[in-house]
Regions:
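Short, flexible helix-loop junctions that flank or precede catalytic/ligand sites
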Residues: 1-156
Length: 156
């Protein structure tokens, strides 16, 4: 009998992250958490999970919110990127970029976070943006509606 949390370890229980994502859809989860998404198949599975209403969380190693979008989209073959972009932007709700940096005085670290909530209005703007301007537009939206890393550093 399953409890409220089901965990699978790679490669002990399943061979890959994509198999974990696909396997999770059989259990009708509310939430899927994948440690790291770095290939097209894992990202495709995460996006598909989000499309079905599952809260899908993962890490993508990047240095900014716009770079995160770029990394996710550019992992896919060129011929798939437009459709992936539309699907991603339709299901995306929040991107957070975090860095741990030394505190002034050198005692400990502080988490600096850059984030942008993908509200319906922001998603609409990005969906109406030509693909070649998507990252630049995301940067503009981040400055206007999100929190940039520089702002987090100044507040810390």
């Amino acid at each position: 009998q399953g409890g409220p949390v089901s965990q699978s370890t790679i490669p002990e229980h399943l061979q890959s992250f994509i198999r974990a994502v696909r396997n999770s859809t059989r259990t009708a989860p509310n939430v899927v958490l994948i440690g790291e998404s770095r290939d097209a198949e894992t990202l495709r599975g995460m996006i598909e999970s989000a499309e079905t209403g599952v809260a899908a969380y993962s890490t993508v190693h990047t240095r900014s919110v716009p770079e995160t979008l770029s990394r996710i989209i550019n992992v896919f073959p060129v011929e798939e990127r437009l459709q992936v972009t539309v699907t991603l932007l339709s299901s995306l709700r929040l991107v957070v970029n975090q860095r741990l940096v030394p505190m002034l005085g050198g005692k400990g670290r502080v988490a600096l976070r850059e984030f942008l909530a993908f509200t319906p209005e922001i998603r609409e703007v990005l969906l109406d943006t030509p693909p070649e301007r998507l990252i630049q537009t995301c940067e503009t939206l981040l400055i206007k509606y999100g929190q940039r890393m520089q702002d987090a550093a100044q507040a810390a």
